[in-house]
């Protein structure tokens, strides 16, 4: 039976600490519950989870939906998107069956790469390799979490780059529902033959916006600072996440909100 491999490639760097990581953890469970109600997805979709920070790691290898158990997302330092792409390409080579003269292989993998930051490694070699060897072998969808995710590197290798403008709990739920609907749509479309391109569900523009240009893809977050340290007593690493707070300045003559 031909499978539809689905890879979730998730940024678990320090900037994801807190609500974002917790929402993605809950989102994976929500995704599986929804897909298990779709007979088309149950028949064809196989899911894998790859987490990356400074280094990538496969948390769950490709497995059918009925046997999938949501992994616990770790937390790390760094945002090595280039290394994550190299790891993803290795997973595709090892686990996705290619067509031969004797039999057809798996359908084109569907990849959802999610990040809230800018790559901390050199992506150029991975970008070139993806465009040369994998752009026609897999459908990559890149999602920026929050208004400050720098997606210019990914927009050069995929026409499907989107941004979640406000990473609220409800927005994450709607985003996960969109991922689920996209997997279901792709599962249904391959029933009549392999589609020439990815078939995604309609984007809810109140939650996500498609990136149309390199200028839209670049952003810098000046409201957060992440500091890493090591406990002198326990010798364990820790993270401190600071958010710029707004303050109200008021005198007898005027009132203004400042940062």
Residue ranges and their predicted role:
Residues 1-60, 67-107, 110-114, 139-153, ...:
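Von Willebrand factor
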Residues 236-258:
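An acidic, Ser/Thr-enriched
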Residues 35-42, 93-103, 133-134, 187:
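Alpha-helix termini
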Residues 28-36, 87-97, 126-130:
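Short, well-ordered amphipathic alpha-helices
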Residues 99, 117-157:
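VWA/integrin I-like adhesion module and closely mimicked acidic/polar interface patches used
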Residues 147-204, 208, 227, 233:
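Von Willebrand factor A/integrin I-like adhesion domains
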Residues 3-4, 107-108, 136-139, 158-159:
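Short glycine-/polar-rich loops that comprise or flank the Walker A/P-loop
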């Amino acid at each position: 039976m031909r499978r539809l491999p689905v890879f979730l490639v998730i940024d678990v760097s320090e900037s994801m600490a807190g609500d974002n990581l917790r929402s993605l953890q809950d989102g994976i469970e929500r995704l599986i519950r929804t897909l298990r109600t779709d007979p088309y997805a149950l028949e064809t979709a196989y899911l894998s989870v790859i987490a990356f920070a400074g280094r990538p790691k496969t948390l769950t290898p490709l497995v059918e939906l009925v046997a999938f158990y949501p992994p616990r997302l770790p937390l790390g330092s760094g945002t090595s998107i280039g290394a994550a792409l190299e790891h993803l390409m290795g997973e595709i080579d090892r686990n996705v069956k290619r067509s031969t003269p004797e039999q057809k292989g798996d359908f084109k993998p569907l990849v959802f790469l999610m990040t809230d930051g800018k790559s901390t490694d050199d992506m150029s070699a991975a970008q070139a390799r993806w465009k040369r060897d994998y752009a026609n072998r897999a459908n990559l969808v890149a999602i920026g979490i929050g208004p400050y995710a720098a997606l210019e590197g990914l927009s050069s290798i995929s026409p499907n780059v989107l941004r979640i403008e406000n990473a609220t709990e409800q927005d994450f739920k709607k985003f996960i529902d969109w991922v689920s609907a996209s997997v279901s749509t792709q599962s249904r479309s391959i029933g009549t033959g392999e589609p020439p391109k990815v078939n995604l569900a309609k984007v809810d523009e109140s939650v996500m916006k498609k990136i149309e240009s390199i200028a839209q893809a670049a952003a810098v977050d000046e409201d957060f600072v992440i500091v890493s340290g090591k406990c002198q007593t326990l010798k364990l690493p820790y993270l401190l996440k600071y958010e710029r707070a707004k303050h109200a300045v008021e005198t007898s003559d005027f009132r203004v909100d400042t940062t």
